[in-house]
């Protein structure tokens, strides 16, 4: 018998962590000698640390190669404790068999493994704090990265909790059980949470964890949160008077209003001004046929400066306002108020001395004067009051200056 026996090293996995290594005898294999040969005598193994080319002696690592006796024959094992292995290190295991007459295998059995006890890590950065349905579905903000320096990422898991009732998302509903859902992909992972499963004005907490190929599971989770907001803001136009002239019109603040938002807060306010006589819209410098939304000064309390020279006598104007919040919701039922610009004085009517309809030419009273008037009119804003004066000459005011009736 001059033919050597043969052996095979069988290491099931490429990567092991401490728990995985301890679960089973992980260095094992088979050996045999051909039929009609002397038969297998024993099997030895050599274990090399590939990071520094040292060999296991049975108790320590040495620069000299040591062949160590395995347990068994046709099926053999070798016990190497996890405490002898170093995180992040690859090991090469070789086997050689010897037969009954001393022939030694020269084409060694060979397999490798890498020991990995370092947890993977993940990142999660939800770009915004507030989302509405369109913003959430288009941004797909549940995504991030995962990394592992040794064995690589096997899977990424997502945990989603609803703050309003502490329930967890299970992929199609909300339940009391904490359920980690599988993310799509690994190194660049994502998770689809449809907006239809989100409730208005509710905060959601997201946690991410990864598992590497060696079975290490991340324990310091990446986390972030967001608030779902689909309620539009509210705004009002507050125009103090129904009618203005060039004296009481304030170009700085006659057009003003307020706005509010209960969840994400206000982002901006826009107003549009319609000239009702011809359906033209104010564009900021001139009137155009297309509606224009322009920004006033301020947000929660706002004003818009408009010179009275841009207003036309006898014409009414309608001012609309709409708010947009940080989540992107735009007010649909807009604020609205109107005013009319009136520069035309009332039309004078008839004034009669005395209390009768016929003008009185004389009076015998030395203590009282009386008068009546009629047919005064105003086509735009209407008449709200009268003043009278008394003079010793027509149109004079020397006896009594203008006094409100």
What are these language model-derived features?
Residues 55-75, 167-190, 280-301, 387-405:
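Recognizes extended acidic, P/S/T-rich segments that occur
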Residues 1-9, 14, 99, 109-125, ...:
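Flexible, low-complexity linkers/stalks enriched in Thr/Pro that connect modular domains
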Residues 43-45, 156-158, 269-271, 386-388:
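Short beta-strand elements bearing conserved aromatic residues within extracellular beta-rich modules
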Residues 30-35, 145-149, 258-262, 372-380:
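Acidic, Ser/Thr
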Residues 82-89, 195-202, 308-315:
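Surface-exposed, short loops/turns at beta-strand junctions within beta-sandwich domains
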Residues 14-23, 129-138, 243-251, 358-366:
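Short, solvent-exposed loop/linker segments at the N-terminal edge
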Residues 25-28, 139-143, 253-256, 368-374:
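A short beta-strand segment in extracellular, disulfide-stabilized domains
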